[in-house]
């Protein structure tokens, strides 16, 4: 809801809500190695139903974790033949059930590439994405099993702890396609500079991966470079976690003058 108000207001774009299980403060089961597998699959399926009913030619997806890119990117791949993905993320998102990490948000790009070990690939309606159709921007150090996945599938990547991919590299990639999808994981931003990201919460552990290193100014430059040189047909903004705003909300909920009739 907060992201909806942060983004520019655009009366030409209809808003559709994907039905997902609301936070209930409870733990879900790990099924077939996937945490809350039934709920994850139900969200993807509902998103696909909306897309197939509305039939948009462009899709903006906001909210949720990285798994929210699966349905729209798969759908748009069924519309556009020449389609590349710019994956702006501190992490590669190619983990599988075999790697022992149960959270599906880390599986999504592997799933879009047709990796069977995600327990989600069977939900795809269209062909898989190929290794040469993916460009990582902002990628930080990766686990050995992720490196193995990328190497075996010939996915080109550069660890960007010291230097991000250049504008020329982005232009070279986007020039090979008629259309581009952008996946933006907010955790690509430096958690020391931007606090509405997973890694700004010291209580969270995840899979041991680290924070992104990008500044807001650099991210803006990257997005401007992409849109100036290609036709963007899909844009995901994932993993925006407004911890400070949540803390304020909890505090204000206990103030009588704000809650009394």
Model-derived regions: residue spans:
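A general structural motif
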Residues: 117-118, 137-142, 214-218
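Short, structured patches in soluble enzyme cores that scaffold and shape functional sites
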Residues: 87-90, 113, 136-141, 159-161, ...
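Active-site histidine-anchored catalytic micro-motif
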Residues: 58-127, 133
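Catalytic cores of soluble, metal-dependent hydrolases
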Residues: 1-60, 68-78, 149-151, 155-261
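Short, glycine/polar-rich helix-capping loops at beta-to-alpha or helix-loop-helix junctions
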Residues: 142-148
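Short glycine-enriched loops at secondary-structure junctions
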Residues: 91-92, 140-142, 185-189
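Residue-level detector of flexible, active-site-proximal loop/helix-junction positions
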Residues: 22, 92, 116, 141, ...
């Amino acid at each position: 809801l907060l992201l909806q108000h942060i983004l520019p207001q655009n009366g030409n774009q209809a808003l559709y809500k994907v039905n997902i299980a609301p936070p209930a403060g409870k733990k879900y089961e790990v099924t077939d190695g996937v945490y809350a597998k039934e709920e994850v699959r139900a969200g993807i399926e509902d998103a696909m139903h909306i897309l197939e009913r509305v039939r948009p030619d462009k899709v903006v997806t906001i909210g949720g974790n990285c798994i929210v890119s699966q349905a729209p990117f798969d759908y748009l791949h069924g519309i556009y033949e020449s389609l590349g993905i710019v994956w702006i993320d501190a992490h590669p998102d190619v983990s599988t059930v075999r790697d022992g990490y149960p959270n599906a948000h880390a599986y999504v790009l592997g799933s879009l590439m047709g990796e069977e070990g995600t327990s989600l690939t069977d939900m795809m309606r269209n062909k898989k994405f190929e290794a040469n159709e993916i460009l990582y921007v902002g990628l930080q150090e990766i686990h050995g099993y992720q490196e193995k996945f990328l190497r075996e599938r010939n996915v080109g990547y550069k660890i960007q702890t010291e230097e991000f991919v250049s504008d020329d590299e982005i232009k070279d990639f986007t020039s090979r396609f008629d259309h581009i999808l952008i996946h933006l994981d907010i955790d690509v931003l430096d958690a020391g500079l931007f606090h509405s990201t997973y890694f700004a919460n010291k209580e969270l552990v995840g899979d041991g991966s680290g924070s992104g290193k990008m500044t807001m100014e650099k991210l803006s430059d990257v997005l401007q470079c992409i849109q100036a040189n290609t036709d963007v047909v899909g844009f995901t903004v994932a993993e925006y976690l407004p911890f400070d705003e949540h803390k304020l909300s909890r505090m204000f909920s206990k103030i009588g003058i704000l809650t009394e009739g």
